[in-house]
């Protein structure tokens, strides 16, 4: 895998308006004088036994669920942790912090064709190596991996929580690497590798300066955006590359007919097909799918042969698409205000 060459310039301890501040104030305004920030809970996980726990899930389970409002910072030391990770809905404000995404790896190898206790295949949605059900989850410098390989659907991560953030992380898989099932998510300086539909789901998500690595002929996105949801996936200032060189991929295909996916200022190698988008043999999506680009560059970025049912945005239209507008929701969440 290609190394992430430019880690984000700030770490969680400094970048999130201080973790406790973020908890008390998601908009990241200053805390009023006289009000103290809550103290975070710090836990160290180390595979070599030098921390409080040797596996991540044990550290997660050590913190009681309930109405706790102080953030939990789990420092994961370098190592490969082969385990299923589950952050339950009641465990809000969890932060997984590694030291280097290439050295701190959370991995498992379930896939959809494995037989369950009833003798039937377990299916896509029971395969995530990591599952995030809780709101206000953050990860930094971590690799999330499904190591099953080219055997069918095999999720590296499933996110159902709202206001999740991932900084300088890697997501490694083959088919269905990342499922963003609901809520809002923000990815910055991340590396995402896969083959077929490897970023999919109904959530609203912003990807900033991410490297998308295509592992063969396939599809990058498969959004299932609800009709009444203004945005699905937005990629801004990203880079798309591929291996092997002769492979070709689509930017997306609609898992549901109102799929919404936008690429802004994204560099696209020749792996991106000239037509750009695929309709999944659903011609009705030509009227309903919301696919758009602005200023795509590189050999795969030319608009000349794009399908006529996808849109090329004007400069003004693109400028209006910001993290605050896309992710704001009812609470005004804006990760850029951290």
Tell me what each language-model feature is.
Residues 5, 18-19, 292:
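Small/flexible residues
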Residues 9-11, 28, 66:
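Intrinsically disordered, low-complexity segments enriched in proline/serine/threonine
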Residues 1-8:
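N-terminal secretory signal peptides that target proteins for export/translocation
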Residues 11-26:
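Bacterial N-terminal signal peptides
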Residues 31-338:
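Sequence-level preference for short, compositionally simple segments enriched
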């Amino acid at each position: 895998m290609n190394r992430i060459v430019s880690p984000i310039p700030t770490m969680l301890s400094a970048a999130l308006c201080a973790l406790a501040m973020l908890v008390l104030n998601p908009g990241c305004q200053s805390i009023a004088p006289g009000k103290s920030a809550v103290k975070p809970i710090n836990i160290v996980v180390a595979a070599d036994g030098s921390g409080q726990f040797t596996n991540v899930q044990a550290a997660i389970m050590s913190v009681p669920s309930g109405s706790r409002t102080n953030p939990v910072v789990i420092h994961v030391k370098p190592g490969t942790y082969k385990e299923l990770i589950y952050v339950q809905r009641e465990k809000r404000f969890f932060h997984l912090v590694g030291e280097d995404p290439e050295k701190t790896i959370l991995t498992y190898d379930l896939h959809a064709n494995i037989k369950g206790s009833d003798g039937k295949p377990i299916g896509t949605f029971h395969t995530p190596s990591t599952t995030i059900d809780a709101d206000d989850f953050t990860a930094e410098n971590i690799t999330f991996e499904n190591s099953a390989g080219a055997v069918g659907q095999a999720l590296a991560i499933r996110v159902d929580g709202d206001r999740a953030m991932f900084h300088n992380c890697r997501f490694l898989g083959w088919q269905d690497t990342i499922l963003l099932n609901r809520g809002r998510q923000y990815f910055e300086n991340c590396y995402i590798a896969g083959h077929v539909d490897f970023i999919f789901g109904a959530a609203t998500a912003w990807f900033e300066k991410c490297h998308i690595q295509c592992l063969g002929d396939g599809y990058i996105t498969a959004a299932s955006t609800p009709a009444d949801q203004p945005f699905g996936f937005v990629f801004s200032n990203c880079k798309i590359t591929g291996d092997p060189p002769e492979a070709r991929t689509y930017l997306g295909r609609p898992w549901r007919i109102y799929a919404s996916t936008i690429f802004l200022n994204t560099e696209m190698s020749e792996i991106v097909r000239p037509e750009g988008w695929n309709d999944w043999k659903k011609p009705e999506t030509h009227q309903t799918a919301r696919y758009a680009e602005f200023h795509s560059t590189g050999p795969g970025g030319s608009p000349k042969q794009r399908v006529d049912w996808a849109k090329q945005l004007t400069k003004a239209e693109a400028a209006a698409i910001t993290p605050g507008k896309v992710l704001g929701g009812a609470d005004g969440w804006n990760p850029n205000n951290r």
